[in-house]
């Protein structure tokens, strides 16, 4: 084996690599097994890698050692596994793959290259994949064998048994030491077999699976050779300096480090695999090996900004490269200011690394990646955004084959306009339904376009109650073949629906539009779908879809409603058409359908069936059924009895819906289902007040963004870890700048983005990063919550899973101190208490679900979370300090006037301006500026002493609505005013115009039945506890006229008013 301490520069003989030619050229190296052989012969004594070991020791391996280990491992594989040709139908590999489930170290590299040398494609699995994802990948690739490392074999025993039962051979891999033969002549191992076709698939990686199950990503010999040829150094000294890499080897970027070791001689140093690397251990590793560069994940670098020694060590390196996720701009700026030469890596698993690995010099800007020039690519112009030009990258790495268009939108560095770019967003669209729920169409579109009979699929449904999809057949259909084509693709659509949220499911084949023969789906010059143009082309067809869905529900056999037997008729419709699995005898007239699991899509379908049956009724022939049974009908009348009453007496629809007497059952059920399991007798020290590391959710919202800013400005806070959804747009300052929040560079540097999947195991966080959180976080502020007043309680289960996942994180890890957990609840959770008690003030205490639950999903969902937290505060009292904060009406910022235009109050004023009429809202209001609200969260997070389990965030000083409307009328130039009910009728009757002129209509049921009581003083929150724990609330007064004026000026500035 090689020597770690050798500092003498050895000449490295670079192989004549060819990834461009489709056919093998004489003397060229066209595959990784050939490259291993080349280096074993020409660079035998040059170090391939250095593997860290527990206790600070190292193993050093030359290229000759690597060849010997791979050859011996290949021999072991042939003796212990049933290797052979793929038997799977539609196989993408000639030979059946072998899965590798191993920790990221030299042992994984040895097994991977041993399989490559045998022509057996390794399927390299991430160690954080759950069992169902692993089984999916094994089946979809036709893998016949599964190798697990010794370290992981214990936890994997149940899974191994399941694999064996499915006919997959399993084996525990040997440690890499068993494959070494010190002193053996490398020539005795012969040479590996040379692949005939450079385009054969030789390696299988996989996607992250953030939008469903992970999919296998096939990599050919040429693609691999392209991937490892990404380095460009000016001197041998730059090329051969040791390179520490903590990038996981089972990800695409993990191949870069061993790749450049084989192509330019840059020896890789791997951390010990006995634990999760942290920045302290990485810095120590760099110092002990005299490494010259570092490749790592952004999260590790987030931890170095307050480590003076770490900054000094990293500043002495040739470069520090990051890939796989975005480095927070504030962190990057601070590292660059410390003299660290940051290098931005860019690429996709499918394309391979598209950026150069080099030593940054001169005025290279770390925020941009430097594009490789050894491939074919084109840069196309896109529509500018916010005055900044945007671009699209299309590559054809090898000069032939199909173009590969990268989904990211790019901006360019004007100093290096041909090569330096940054990714600023993706094309992935989210469709907002009429309920306010957000539907992500990617799973549906991807599964359809992957089908052999489909050329393109485009989902639609903006401001509708469900999605539809436009499908372009791959081949022209026979005359009259549309119905048969829909039948053919319908199982795919159903399968996609099983992986999507209930509200995203395609309801029937009526919602499928088949592109006619001769009609071309609009595309950009580079072949991507031009979504806006598609919607314009098929506007009439999409309109017909929703009209058909409304008309054709139930078919000709649907019986008309009979007012004499109305409850029985409605019950029969529910049993037959809703999709609920409930027997007729089990459905009482008084129980809420949502207690039986009715989801938003089923509610929509049931409303359509009821409307269709009502339209057939002789007794209702002169009635406007759409007004009697509006889109929100089932939400407002969730039981059979309530529906019957509302249909028999339509005038009662002007009154608020009655409270569902059984709503508390759903709250208690979910509170029990998602409670933090177990109990802990451990008693830790009180939570810390200094050097805090705070996890925050909901940072894209108004309160969340201000909480993050307030924390970042406080010297007690060392780091703010912002949880963002996986697949969301790149992290930048936009959530703060759009609200007028200015952060200094050192403040912004504290903010660290962390992509999560709220419903996945360990929140979908990489094990290394999750381990760091377990051992370092001190506080959690959970502010994420969807603003949707029509969603049912069962639809909030993913939020309960999110809370459960955060509580599990908060109670894990080895820390000496308790952790504080602050949850942002709502006035809605307890509003019923005041409404049913003549406006009595609500005290800051826990409430009973039987008294507070109201049947509105948004409100009852918050109540479920309160009950989950109350249980955790008792069962884990020695580990957690828990508080929830019920928030009243928050306004925009006191400092800047920035107030989100999509909130209730701005909606009222925009609608009023376009109507030319103001509403007269009775009573008083209690408004608290969002920056004051954020300061209260801060006060509570670091309060000296025991936390109150419940407190209220509301302005203790109330103001008159009449005074506010007088001022608003003068600003808007509106003199006319009518009562609140009359104004709502005007808004509801207004014709929809362009640009969302009457936004109140979007949430009409909420404004009609819920807004008034909570906004006008019928629901008043006590604030004694809050005032006792916060000077911010204690000293708060009424909002002055100048502050209120700032809000109107802000809405005017952004062209909302």
From Swiss-Prot:
BP term (GO), one: terpenoid biosynthetic process
UniProt entry keywords in alphabetical sequence: ATP-binding, NADP, Nucleotide-binding, Oxidoreductase, Phosphopantetheine, Phosphoprotein
Carrier domain ranges (all copies): 564-651
Pathway: Secondary metabolite biosynthesis; terpenoid biosynthesis
Molecular function as annotated in GO: ATP binding; oxidoreductase activity
Modified residues (O-(pantetheine 4'-phosphoryl)serine): 600
Pfam family, one: AMP-binding
Domain of life: Eukaryota
Reactions it catalyzes: ilicicolinate B + AH2 + ATP = ilicicolin B + A + AMP + diphosphate
Transmembrane feature ranges: none
Chain residue ranges for the region called Reductase (R) domain: 693-1025
Start and end residues of each stretch annotated as Adenylation (A) domain: 21-378
Residues annotated for AMP binding in this entry: 251, 344-345, 349, 423-426
InterPro entries named in the record: ACP-like_sf, Adenylate-forming_Reductase, AMP-binding_CS, AMP-dep_synth/lig_dom, ANL_N_sf, Far_NAD-bd, NAD(P)-bd_dom_sf, PP-bd_ACP
Keyword Hydrolase: no
Protein residues bound to NADP(+): 700-703, 783-785, 858, 862
EC numbers: 1.2.1.-
Domain notes: Contains three distinct domains: an adenylation (A) domain that activates the substrate amino acid which is subsequently covalently linked as a thioester (aminoacyl-S-PCP) to the 4'-phosphopantetheine prosthetic group of the second domain, the peptidyl carrier protein (PCP) domain, as well as a reductase (R) release domain.
Stated role: Nonribosomal peptide synthase-like protein; part of the cluster that mediates the biosynthesis of LL-Z1272-beta, also known as ilicicolin B, a prenylated aryl-aldehyde produced by several fungi and that serves as a key pathway intermediate for many fungal meroterpenoids. The first step in the pathway is performed by the non-reducing polyketide synthase stbA that produces orsellinic acid by condensing acetyl-CoA with 3 malonyl-CoA units. The prenyltransferase stbC then prenylates orsenilic acid into grifolic acid. Finally, grifolic acid is reduced to ilicicolin B by the NRPS-like protein stbB.
Family from the record: Belongs to the adenylate-forming reductase family.
Name of the featured protein: Adenylate-forming reductase stbB
């Amino acid at each position: 084996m090689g020597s770690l301490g050798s500092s003498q520069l050895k000449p490295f003989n670079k192989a004549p690599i060819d990834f461009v030619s489709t056919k093998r050229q004489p003397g060229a190296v066209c595959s990784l097994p050939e490259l291993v052989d080349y280096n074993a012969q020409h660079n035998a004594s040059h170090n391939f890698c250095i593997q860290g070991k527990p206790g600070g020791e190292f193993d050093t391996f030359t290229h000759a050692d690597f060849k010997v280990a791979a050859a011996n491992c290949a021999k072991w594989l042939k003796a212990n596994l049933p290797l052979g040709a793929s038997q799977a139908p539609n196989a993408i590999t000639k030979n059946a793959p072998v899965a590798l489930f191993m920790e990221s170290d030299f042992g994984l590299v040895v097994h991977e290259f041993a399989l490559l040398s045998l022509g057996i494609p390794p399927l390299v699995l991430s160690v954080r994949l759950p069992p169902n994802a692993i089984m999916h990948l094994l089946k979809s690739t036709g893998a016949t064998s599964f190798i697990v490392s010794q370290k992981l074999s214990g936890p994997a025993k149940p899974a191994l048994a399941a694999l064996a039962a499915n006919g997959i051979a399993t084996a525990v891999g040997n440690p890499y030491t068993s494959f070494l033969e010190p002193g053996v002549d490398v020539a005795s191992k012969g040479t590996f077999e040379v692949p005939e076709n450079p385009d054969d698939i030789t390696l299988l990686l996989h996607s992250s699976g953030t939008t469903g199950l992970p999919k296998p990503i096939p990599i050919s010999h040429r693609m691999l050779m392209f991937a490892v040829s990404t380095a460009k150094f000016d001197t041998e000294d730059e090329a051969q300096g040791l390179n520490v890499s903590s990038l996981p080897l089972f990800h695409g970027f993990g191949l870069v480090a061993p790749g450049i070791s084989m192509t330019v001689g840059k020896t890789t140093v791997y951390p010990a695999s006995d634990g999760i690397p942290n920045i302290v251990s990485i810095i120590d590793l760099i110092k002990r090996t005299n490494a010259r560069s570092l490749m790592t994940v952004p999260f590790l670098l987030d931890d170095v900004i307050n480590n003076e020694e770490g900054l000094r060590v990293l500043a002495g390196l040739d470069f520090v490269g990051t890939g796989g996720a975005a480095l927070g701009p504030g962190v990057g700026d601070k590292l660059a200011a410390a003299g660290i030469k940051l290098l931005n890596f860019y690429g996709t698993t499918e394309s391979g690394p598209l950026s150069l690995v080099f030593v940054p010099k001169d005025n290279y800007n770390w925020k941009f990646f430097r594009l490789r020039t050894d491939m074919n690519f084109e840069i196309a112009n896109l529509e500018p955004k916010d005055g900044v030009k945007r671009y699209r990258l299309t590559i054809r790495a090898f000069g032939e084959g199909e173009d590969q268009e990268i989904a990211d939108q790019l901006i360019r560095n004007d100093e290096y306009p041909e090569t330096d770019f940054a990714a600023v967003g993706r094309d992935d669209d989210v469709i907002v339904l009429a309920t306010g729920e957000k539907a992500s169409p990617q799973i549906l579109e991807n599964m359809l376009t992957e089908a052999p009979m489909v050329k393109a699929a485009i989902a639609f449904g903006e401001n509708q109650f469900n999605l539809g999809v436009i499908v372009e057949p791959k081949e022209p259909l026979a005359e009259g073949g549309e119905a048969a084509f829909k039948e053919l693709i319908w199982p795919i659509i159903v399968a996609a629906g099983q992986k999507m949220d209930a509200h995203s499911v395609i309801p029937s084949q009526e919602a499928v539009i088949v592109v006619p023969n001769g009609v071309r789906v609009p595309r950009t010059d580079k072949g991507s779908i031009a979504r806006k143009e598609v919607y314009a082309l098929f506007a009439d067809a999409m309109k017909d879809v929703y009209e058909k869905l409304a008309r054709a529900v139930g078919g000709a056999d649907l019986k008309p409603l009979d007012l004499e037997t109305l409850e029985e008729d409605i019950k029969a419709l529910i049993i037959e058409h809703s999709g609920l699995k409930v027997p007729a005898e089990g459905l009482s007239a008084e129980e809420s359908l949502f207690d039986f699991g009715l989801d938003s899509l089923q509610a929509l379908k049931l409303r359509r069936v009821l409307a269709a049956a009502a339209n057939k009724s002789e007794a209702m022939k002169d009635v406007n059924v759409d007004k009697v049974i509006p889109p929100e009908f089932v939400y407002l009348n969730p039981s059979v009895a309530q529906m019957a009453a509302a249909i028999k007496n339509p005038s009662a629809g002007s009154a608020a819906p009655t409270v569902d007497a059984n709503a508390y059952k759903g709250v208690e059920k979910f509170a029990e289902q998602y409670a933090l399991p177990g109990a802990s007798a451990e008693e830790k020290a009180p939570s810390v007040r200094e050097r805090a590391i705070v996890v925050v959710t909901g940072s894209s919202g108004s309160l969340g963004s201000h909480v993050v800013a307030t924390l970042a400005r406080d010297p007690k806070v060392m780091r703010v870890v912002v949880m963002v959804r996986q697949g969301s747009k790149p992290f930048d300052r936009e959530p703060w700048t759009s609200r007028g929040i200015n952060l200094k560079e050192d403040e912004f540097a504290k903010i660290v983005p962390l992509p999560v999947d709220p419903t996945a195991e360990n929140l979908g966080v990489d094990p290394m990063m999750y381990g760091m959180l377990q051992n370092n976080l001190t506080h959690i502020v959970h502010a994420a919550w969807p603003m949707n007043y029509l969603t049912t309680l069962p639809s909030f289960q993913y939020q309960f899973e999110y809370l459960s996942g955060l509580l599990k994180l908060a109670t894990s890890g080895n820390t000496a101190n308790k952790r504080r957990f602050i949850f942002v609840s709502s006035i809605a959770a307890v509003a019923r208490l005041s409404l049913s008690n003549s406006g009595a003030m609500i005290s800051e205490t826990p409430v009973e679900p039987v008294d507070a639950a109201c049947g509105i999903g948004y409100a009852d969902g918050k109540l479920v979370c309160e009950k989950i937290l109350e249980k955790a505060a008792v069962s884990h009292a020695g580990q957690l300090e828990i508080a929830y904060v019920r928030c009243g009406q928050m306004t925009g910022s006191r400092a800047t006037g920035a107030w989100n235009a999509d909130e209730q109050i701005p909606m009222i004023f925009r609608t009023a301006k376009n109507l030319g009429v103001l509403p007269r809202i009775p009573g008083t209001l209690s408004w608290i500026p969002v920056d004051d609200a954020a300061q209260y969260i801060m006060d509570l997070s670091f309060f000296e002493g025991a936390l109150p389990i419940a407190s209220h965030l509301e302005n203790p000083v109330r103001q008159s609505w009449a005074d506010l409307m007088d001022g608003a009328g003068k600003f808007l130039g509106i003199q006319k005013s009518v009562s609140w009910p009359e104004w709502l009728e005007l808004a509801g009757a207004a014709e929809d115009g362009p640009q969302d002129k009457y936004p109140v209509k979007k949430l009409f049921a909420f404004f009609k039945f819920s807004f008034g009581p909570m906004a006008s003083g019928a629901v008043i929150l006590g604030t004694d506890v809050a005032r006792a724990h916060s000077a911010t609330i204690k000293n708060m007064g009424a909002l002055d006229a100048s502050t209120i004026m700032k809000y109107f000026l802000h809405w005017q500035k952004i062209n909302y008013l």
